[in-house]
């Protein structure tokens, strides 16, 4: 099996975009993990929907803001696909957190199931975009 080819170096414009996105990204990963853990703790330990709501509300606000921040970045044409993947991930994380909050209101378990699927898809989108923007980055998923 031949070694994987080295990714091409980013242009100055691409590097500026990647650095701007990194400022958002470094908050995305812990927020996504916190959202997952809040759901796990609810399911396995507390079954306290009020506590779940208190944990998810700030995460939902973060993802709404992150989606707007990512959407507002100036994107080089060469990175439009990666940008689209990342922006879709932010939308999915926002929708997932909204689903979890909906669960705290009506108790409909389908909200949690849907949120889990959205979170997984968002994580995959971020990994794909990250391969282009930050090749070689440690991926804990």
What are the residue ranges of the model-derived segments?
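Alpha-helical segments in soluble extracytoplasmic regions
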Residues: 6-85, 89, 97, 104, ...
């Amino acid at each position: 099996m031949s070694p994987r080819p080295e990714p091409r170096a980013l242009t100055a414009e691409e590097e500026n975009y990647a650095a701007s996105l990194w400022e958002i990204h470094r908050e995305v990963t812990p927020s996504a993990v916190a959202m997952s853990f809040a759901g796990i703790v609810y399911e396995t330990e507390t079954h306290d929907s009020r506590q779940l709501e208190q944990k998810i509300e700030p995460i939902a606000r973060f993802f709404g803001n992150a989606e707007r921040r990512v959407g507002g970045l100036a994107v080089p044409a060469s990175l439009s696909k990666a940008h689209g993947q990342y922006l879709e991930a932010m939308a999915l994380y926002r929708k997932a957190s909204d689903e979890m909050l909906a669960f705290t209101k009506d108790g409909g378990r389908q909200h949690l199931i849907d949120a889990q699927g959205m979170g997984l898809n968002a994580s995959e989108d971020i990994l794909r975009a990250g391969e282009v923007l930050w090749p070689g980055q440690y991926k804990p998923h």
